[in-house]
């Protein structure tokens, strides 16, 4: 269980899996059999069946059992005792052989142990809180990866459709130029230029199809099944979660990010462990009692022994174990404190990175949309100019390429903005199953 928490925290403070995947997705977007698929309904399946989340839930169950186990020393002990054997007693010159039998009931209740027992319970409860926060971090990591996979499918599909349309348009234009050359209205150079662009368009389509199929395979690995159709993501469902400013987001993240909450709980739990470390040197008070019956003893029949008492134990020397254990715990606390400092910096870094990408893609969407409109107008003008002999075939081909580039850039900017939107929520620690409308199985 502890190893699981450490693994997630180490991964987070070294950059975070979800942030690396997010940056990778943005790079892909900017550079390069089922029912209709609604992302939120598809995420429900991931939330229910993902093995990493399942392991986190198992760790939480183990931590809950640890809390119960920590309370056992607060409970009384009650047990049955008994023994039977052979004995010989010599008295007045006679030997007496007999088989004494002893049985009874005993109990013990610890009343005080220097506060170590209560510290043990509090430490277990805090450890449970840490594991629960760690599970929240795991859930958000997995859900962010799943969302990125869904967005990449949408982006790859849109780019594929644009390339297919471009191939169709250039194919028609190539046929037009070739026919014009047959009647002497264009040159073989024009035909060669149109043919070259058509071949590049075909390559662009093949590459876009490959990127789409790769995105589908990533989706299949994460989600299990691939829907027949992917529906665009409805951000209105989670729009209210988005912060007003990066300052508000940072303040919220530093209070609520699950990795920070897990580390905070671990630090407090470790401080409780100092009291536990001194357990072997702390005084203890027990209440003990017993009722015993002894039979088969010569001259003594039906012996009943009842006793109850308070037992005080004050250790004087334990070979230095308590102090060594306490020093080890203090060193562990210092290490956790350094992890908290680093984790806080990582939270702020990841949040600012996601926020900056979101803001830049807001601008990119508007800029690329304006570029699309301008390139459409430019293409119409170039085509008209060619019809009147003022523009060449190469001018038209270049205008077609500019229009395709701006359309692809606009598509990628839209999907990069959606990815950044969810990355901001994840960096805040707010990409929870509840906020996404998911229900625990």
Where are these regions (language model features)?
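Transmembrane beta-barrel architecture of outer-membrane proteins
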Residues: 100-102, 116, 148, 193, ...
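Small/polar (Gly/Ser/Thr/Ala-rich) solvent-exposed segments
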Residues: 54, 77-98, 108-137, 261, ...
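Acidic, low-complexity, intrinsically disordered peripheral segments
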Residues: 12, 36, 409-441
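Sec-dependent N-terminal signal peptides
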Residues: 22-31
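Bacterial Sec-pathway N-terminal export signals of envelope proteins
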Residues: 34-79, 111, 187, 226-268, ...
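Short, Lys/Arg-enriched N-terminal segments with co-localized hydrophobic residues
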Residues: 2-18
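Amphipathic alpha-helical coiled-coil segments
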Residues: 55-70, 138, 142-163, 172-174, ...
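Periplasmic alpha-helical coiled-coil/stalk elements that build and connect Gram-negative outer-membrane
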Residues: 14-17, 138-252, 354-357, 361, ...
């Amino acid at each position: 269980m502890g190893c699981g928490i450490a693994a997630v925290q180490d991964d987070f403070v070294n950059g975070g899996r979800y942030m690396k995947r997010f940056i990778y997705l943005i790079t892909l977007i900017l550079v390069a059999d089922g029912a209709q698929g609604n992302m939120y309904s598809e995420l429900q399946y991931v939330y229910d069946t993902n093995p990493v989340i399942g392991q986190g839930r198992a760790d939480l169950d183990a931590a809950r059992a640890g809390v119960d186990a920590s309370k056992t020393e607060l409970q009384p002990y009650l047990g049955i005792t008994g023994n039977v054997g052979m004995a010989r007693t010599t008295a007045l010159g006679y030997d007496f052989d007999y088989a004494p039998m002893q049985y009874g009931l005993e109990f013990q209740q610890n009343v005080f142990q220097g506060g170590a027992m209560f510290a043990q319970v509090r430490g277990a409860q805090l450890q449970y809180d840490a594991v629960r926060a760690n599970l929240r971090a795991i859930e958000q990591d997995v859900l962010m990866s799943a969302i990125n996979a869904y967005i990449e499918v949408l982006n790859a599909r849109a780019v594929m459709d644009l390339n297919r349309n471009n191939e169709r348009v250039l194919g028609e234009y190539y046929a037009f130029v070739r026919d014009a050359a047959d009647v002497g209205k264009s040159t073989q150079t024009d035909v060669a230029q149109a043919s070259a662009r058509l071949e590049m368009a075909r390559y662009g389509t093949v590459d876009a199809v490959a990127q789409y199929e790769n995105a589908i395979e990533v989706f299949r690995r994460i989600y299990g099944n691939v829907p027949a159709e992917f529906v665009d993501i409805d951000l209105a469902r989670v729009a209210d979660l988005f912060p007003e400013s990066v300052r508000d987001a940072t303040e919220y993240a530093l209070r609520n990010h699950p990795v920070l909450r897990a580390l905070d709980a671990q630090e407090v739990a470790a401080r409780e462990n100092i009291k536990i470390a001194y357990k072997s040197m702390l005084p203890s008070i027990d209440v003990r009692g017993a009722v015993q019956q002894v039979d088969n003893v010569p001259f003594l029949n039906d012996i009943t022994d009842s006793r109850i008492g308070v037992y005080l134990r004050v250790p004087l020397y334990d070979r230095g174990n308590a102090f060594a254990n306490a020093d080890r715990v203090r060193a562990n606390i210092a290490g956790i404190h350094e992890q908290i400092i680093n984790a806080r910096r990582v939270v702020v870094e990841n949040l600012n990175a996601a926020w900056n990408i979101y803001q830049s893609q807001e601008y990119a969407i508007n800029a690329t949309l304006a570029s699309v409109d301008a390139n459409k107008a430019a293409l119409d003008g170039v085509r008209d100019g060619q019809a009147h002999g003022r523009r060449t075939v190469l001018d038209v081909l270049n205008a077609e390429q500019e229009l395709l580039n701006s359309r692809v850039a606009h598509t990628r900017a839209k999907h990069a903005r959606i990815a950044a939107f969810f990355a901001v929520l994840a960096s805040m620690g707010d990409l929870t199953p509840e906020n996404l409308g998911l229900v625990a199985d």
